[in-house]
Regions:
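Structural motif
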Residues: 34-35, 60-61, 74, 93-94, ...
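Conserved phosphate/ATP/ADP-binding segment of small-molecule kinases
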Residues: 78-131
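Glycine/proline-rich, positively charged
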Residues: 66, 72-74, 100-103
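Short glycine-enriched, charge-decorated loop/helix-capping segments at active-site entrances
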Residues: 8-14, 73-78, 107-111
Length: 131
C-alpha cells in the first residue's frame, strides 16, 4: 500500500508475502487463471511467492515493472532486485520497464538508443521472453 498524493509517494507499507500467497490461492480455487499481470512488488518475500506460483503454473505473465515513482521514490527494496532478476523475470513472458526501470534492472545507464538496446539485451539475459 502506498501513501501518496499528486506531489509524490510519501511512504510504502508492503503487504506481507503470506497475504499475497493466500490471495493467489483464493483466486485460483475460484477460477481458472489464463494469464497474470504483475505490478509493484516491493520485497523478496512477495517476489518469491509470485515466482513460485508461476514456476508451478506456467502461465503467460506480464511484469509491469514498477520500481520508481514518477517523483523518484524507490518502490522496491534494493536487496529485492536480485530476487526479481533471478526468480521472477525468468518466468515472465513480457517485461515492460520504462527508461529509469530499465537502467535499474540492467545496471546500464541509458543516455541514447544504443544504451537502450544494450539494456534491453541485458534484461533478456535474465530469462524473460521479451522486453
Amino acid at each position: 500500500v502506498t501513501i501518496q498524493n499528486t506531489c509524490g509517494v510519501k511512504n510504502i507499507y508492503p503487504i506481507p508475502a503470506q497475504i499475497v500467497k493466500e490471495q493467489i490461492q483464493a483466486v485460483t480455487e475460484d477460477m481458472q487463471i489464463d494469464a497474470l499481470k504483475i505490478g509493484m512488488v516491493t520485497d523478496e518475500g512477495i517476489i518469491a511467492v509470485i515466482a513460485d506460483f508461476l514456476s508451478s503454473n506456467r502461465l503467460p505473465a506480464v511484469f509491469d515493472t514498477v520500481l520508481v515513482s514518477s517523483s523518484g521514490y524507490s518502490l522496491v527494496k534494493p536487496e529485492a532486485l536480485h530476487v526479481m532478476r533471478d526468480r521472477l523475470i525468468p518466468h515472465c513472458t513480457l517485461v515492460t520497464p520504462n527508461l529509469p526501470e530499465a537502467e535499474i534492472l540492467s545496471g546500464i545507464p541509458i543516455r541514447n538508443i544504443e544504451d537502450m538496446a544494450n539494456a534491453g539485451r541485458q534484461i533478456l539475459t535474465y530469462g524473460c521472453r521479451s522486453y
